[in-house]
Amino acid sequence: MAATHNFLMENELLDLDNLDAAVESSRKALSEARESLRGIEQSISDKKNLRKVVSDYRRTRPTIDAHKKLSGKKAEAYYRANEADFIIYEAALRQLKVLAPGKKLPATSKLNTEIEALISEKNAAYNTYRTAKAEYEQLATAKRNAEQILHGTPSRQKKREQER
């Protein structure tokens, strides 16, 4: 309790209205940091998915091109032998139409660079989030303790004794 009083004195939060405002401001900052972090994580996930789809497309494209050159029974036999590649190619093509409609295929190196930049941004955002969370937890704890001091709320130990 003394630590709470010292914290409130140092930060000039002895007035409950100021303390409530500080807690609310800290909660909003925490919420904004969390949303920013989630947005960056979603962007990373989207880029990684696009990279996988492009990789699948590029890996299976030679099989499709070789099939186009064949005809008759050779084409049928080739299709049956490489059916998994055809399925992967068609799925990748459908996803590419959704993820990058009417665009050229992005270079894998460009995607990797974008992912690395997003990961760096995510790390910075996480540091901001961690700082905001620690500040919020400290203020929320101070508020609970201050309310307990002012309103004389029984401590957990006293509540347990009363229950017995």
Q: Model-flagged regions — what are they?
A:
Residues 1-164:
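Extended intrinsically disordered terminal tails
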